[in-house]
């Protein structure tokens, strides 16, 4: 029962939809003479469609009434083809509207293009041949006949350069070109160079130089090839030799860069009398190579005095209320005859002693064999050279980076067990 009811409802909905469509079509294409026939037709039309779809479910009175108006009223069939005819009439109109401008445009295009060349050359034979199909080739012939004269103007340049025995036209061209070489573009210069057989690569200045030079075209490339063949290997080998020399220098300098620890260890041996026993153990660990020059007794005494002066300078610089300064300098032997105070105006800034990224250079000055209290990175080649040069000048040794490294001024006392307090103090702002 549910299937039958659903099928009946679907048929009723279809019939209503078809009736509505027929009413709309009737209102669009309604005529005064056929108004009566249309009023009766939309009510009776859906019944035969329903019967045609499902004759079993169609109503009994609807089936006989459906075909009767079609038989007795032939006028009912007339309004149906009329809207079709009207639709067909509209479609060709639209197609004609779309088709009409195309031939017009083609005709105008064909009318305007040919008369321009016809008026120029050979008007009579082309006018006779215009109604025929092959008017195209004479037009192309006319265009080619027009084009060769401008093409022939640059062509005389090509035969003249190969004609080397005729030097008369060449100087005139050279004079004209030298007058306007700078005005010529790069492409024109290259064309001229190609005509002369010269190389075309290079900047505009090089091209101008080649154009101005009066050497014959065949001798130049040979000379250049010889020069390149003779001179090419030398610049190629020179940088290699230079690189080898630089590498040898770097190998020679590398041991010197790693050799500073041993002389500093020797210095710790010299200063062991006035220092704690900790650096002595460190000196025993670091082997001293034979080629390292041992400092004499006089420089050792001067180094001791300078170290004491430096410690006095540090003591005077830290007269501010800080912590544990006396404890740091307890082990230091005070000199019997102290020298005048060292001026505190160091060339470098005091920030180098603070734990800033610039202090890496100062930390590298301390001997790498000694255990530094702070985890200092690898000795960096760059450092506060002004400050260190000033200290090296005081010690009488050579400046940094020249010859073998001299023993550093800094004594091993700064790396003793109580040296951590000094680093803690250096963290305070100056």
UniProtKB/Swiss-Prot annotation:
A motif (MEF2-binding) lies at residues 12-28. Residues 363-373, 393-403 have a biased composition (Low complexity). Residues 87-103, 207-228 have a biased composition (Basic and acidic residues). It is found in: Nucleus. Residues 84-172, 204-239, 280-301, 330-416 are annotated as: Disordered. InterPro entries: SAP_dom (IPR003034), SAP_dom_sf (IPR036361), TransReg_TumorExp (IPR052305). Residues 181-215 form the SAP domain. Its main location: nucleus. Transmembrane segments: none annotated. Signal peptide: none annotated. Keywords: Activator, Nucleus, Transcription, Transcription regulation. GO terms for biological process: regulation of transcription by RNA polymerase II. One of its GO terms (cellular component) is nucleus. GO terms for molecular function: transcription coregulator activity. Residues 224-430 are annotated as: Transcription activation. Residues 147-170 have a biased composition (Pro residues). Interacts with MEF2C. Transcriptional coactivator. Stimulates the transcriptional activity of MEF2C. Stimulates MYOD1 activity in part via MEF2, resulting in an enhancement of skeletal muscle differentiation. PANTHER family: LYSINE-RICH CEACAM1 CO-ISOLATED PROTEIN LYRIC PROTEIN, MEF2-ACTIVATING MOTIF AND SAP DOMAIN-CONTAINING TRANSCRIPTIONAL REGULATOR. This is MEF2-activating motif and SAP domain-containing transcriptional regulator. It comes from Bos taurus (Bovine).
């Amino acid at each position: 029962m549910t299937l039958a009811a659903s099928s009946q409802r679907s048929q009723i909905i279809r019939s209503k939809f078809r009736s509505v469509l027929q009413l709309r079509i009737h209102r669009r294409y309604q005529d005064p003479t056929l108004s009566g026939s249309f009023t009766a037709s939309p009510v009776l039309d859906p019944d035969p469609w329903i019967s045609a779809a499902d004759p079993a479910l169609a109503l009994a009175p609807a089936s006989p009434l459906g075909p009767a108006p079609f038989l007795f009223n032939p006028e009912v069939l007339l309004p149906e083809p009329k809207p079709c005819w009207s639709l067909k009439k509209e479609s060709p109109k639209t197609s004609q509207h779309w088709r009409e401008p195309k031939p017009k445009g083609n005709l105008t295009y064909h009318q305007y293009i040919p008369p321009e060349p016809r008026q120029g050359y050979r008007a009579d034979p082309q006018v006779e041949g215009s109604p025929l199909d092959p008017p195209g080739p004479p037009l192309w012939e006319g265009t080619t006949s027009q084009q060769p004269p401008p093409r022939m103007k640059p062509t005389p340049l090509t035969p003249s350069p190969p004609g080397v025995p005729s030097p008369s036209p060449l100087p005139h061209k050279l004079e004209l070109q030298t007058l306007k070489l700078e005005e010529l573009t790069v492409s024109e210069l290259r064309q001229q160079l190609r005509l002369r057989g010269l190389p075309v690569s290079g900047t505009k200045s090089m091209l101008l130089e080649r154009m101005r030079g009066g050497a014959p075209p065949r001798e130049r490339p040979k000379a250049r090839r010889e020069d390149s063949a003779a001179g090419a290997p030398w610049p190629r080998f020179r940088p290699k030799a230079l690189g080898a020399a630089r590498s040898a220098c770097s190998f020679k300098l590398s041991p010197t860069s790693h050799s500073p620890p041993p002389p500093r260890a020797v210095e710790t041996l010299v200063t062991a009398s006035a220092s704690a026993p900790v650096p002595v153990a460190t000196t025993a660990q670091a082997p001293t190579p034979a080629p390292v020059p041992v400092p004499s007794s006089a420089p050792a005494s001067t180094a001791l005095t300078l170290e004491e002066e430096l410690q006095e300078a540090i003591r005077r610089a830290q007269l501010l209320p800080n912590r544990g300064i006396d404890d740091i300098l307890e082990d230091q032997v005070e000199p019997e005859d102290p020298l005048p105070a060292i001026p505190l105006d160091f060339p470098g800034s005091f920030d180098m002693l603070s734990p800033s990224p610039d202090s890496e250079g100062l930390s590298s000055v301390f001997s790498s064999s000694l255990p530094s209290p702070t985890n200092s990175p690898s000795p960096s080649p760059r450092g506060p050279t002004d400050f260190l040069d000033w200290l090296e000048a005081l010690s009488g040794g050579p400046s940094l980076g020249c010859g073998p490294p001299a023993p550093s001024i800094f004594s091993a006392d700064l790396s003793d067990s109580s040296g951590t307090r000094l680093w803690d103090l250096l963290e305070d702002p100056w």
